[in-house]
Amino acid sequence: MKTKQDPRDQKNYDSLQSNLFRLIPPTTHKISLARPNGFLRGLADLVGKYSVDGAEESLFQPGAWDAPYVQPAFFDFLVHAKTISKHEPVGVPLFCFKNNSTAPSIDVLFTPISFHAAVGLPADVDPNVHRVAHIWYGDDSEVSSLMEDLNILLEESNLHTRLHPVGILVENNDSSFLNRVTALTHGPAYMSRKQAALKLVIPTDLFVDLDARLNVEAYGAQPSGGTSTVFCTLVYTRCGNDIKPALTFFKSNKSDFDVLTLIRAYYADLITNKLEVNQQCNINGLKFGVMCTVGYTDSSHSINQQSLCIRGSSLLVTSISNFFVNYTGWRVFA
C-alpha cells in the first residue's frame, strides 16, 4: 500500500537540504597576492571561467574599432583611358555625365580641369587651369567628345540635368584601355585601404572664400557655427557669341540662405549681362546657374595652398583638411 506524501515533508526536506549546503564552504580560487604576475594570471583565469569567448566580436560590427568610426562610402567607376589624367591630384572633385549612347558599363567622369578642357573655355577664363588642362589632356583629347548634345544642353541651360556630382578622387588605376577610378562618395575623407586622411583639393583659380572675398556684414550674414560648408556652382556664362559652362567652388560658414544671397551678389554683373543679352526672352535659357553642396569642414582648420609641379608646369591648388564629403543635387539659384 502506497502512503500519501505530505507536502509539509517535502518542504521540510528542501529547507534541510538548503541549510546543509550552506554549511559547505565555497570553492576557493588560488590567486597569489605575493607576486604581481601570479595575481594577474590567477585573476585572468578566474574571469575566463565566467566569460564568453568572442563576446566583443558578437556585440560590435566588423570595423567598428577602426578609425574612422563613421565609415566612408566608396564607389568604383570604369572610364575610358586618358579621360582622367594620371596627373590629377587625389582629393579633386568628380562629376559624372550621363550619355544616352554610352555603354552602361562605361562611365564618363570629369574633374574640374578635364571639364575645362571638354567644354572649350577660353584662355582668359581661369588661365592657370586652362594652361594645365591643355598640357594634361592636349588639344585633341578624347574628353572634348565625351558629352553628346553639349550645344543643345547649353542653349537651354540644362547641362546640370546630365552632369551630376559624385564625390572626390581617391585612386586612379591607369591602363591602356580602361581606368578604374575609385571615388569617396560620402563620409569622412579617408583612403579606402590605408585609412590615411585625404584633403579636398581644388584649383585655386576655381576657389572662392566667400567670407574673406565679400563684405558679408553688408548683407547681414551671420556665422552659422563652427562648421564651414563647401559649395559648387555651375553657371552658364556668355563668351562672345557662345554659352559656356563654368565650375566654381565656394567656402563659407554662413547659413544656406546667407550663402545663396552672397553667391548671387558674387555673380550679380554676369546675371545682369545675361538678362540683357537674352533679347529673345527664351525661357528655356534664362537659368543662369545651379549650386550644390560638396561637404563641410571645421571652421577652425586653416586653408592651405600648394603648387603642384607636373611635366614642367605648376598649378596652384587649395587644400581643405578634415573634410566630410556630403554631396547634394543641383538647385537653381539664379
UniProtKB/Swiss-Prot annotation:
InterPro entries: Herpes_1. GO terms for cellular component: host cell nucleus; viral capsid. Keywords: Capsid protein, Host nucleus, Virion. The keyword Flavoprotein does not apply. Its main location: virion. One of its GO terms (biological process) is viral capsid assembly. The keyword Ribosomal protein does not apply. One of its GO terms (molecular function) is DNA binding. It is found in: Virion; Host nucleus. Interacts with TRX2, MCP and capsid vertex component 2/CVC2. Structural component of the T=16 icosahedral capsid. The capsid is composed of pentamers and hexamers of major capsid protein/MCP, which are linked together by heterotrimers called triplexes. These triplexes are formed by a single molecule of triplex protein 1/TRX1 and two copies of triplex protein 2/TRX2. Additionally, TRX1 is required for efficient transport of TRX2 to the nucleus, which is the site of capsid assembly. Belongs to the herpesviridae TRX1 protein family. This is Triplex capsid protein 1. It comes from Alcelaphine herpesvirus 1 (strain C500) (AlHV-1). The gene is TRX1.
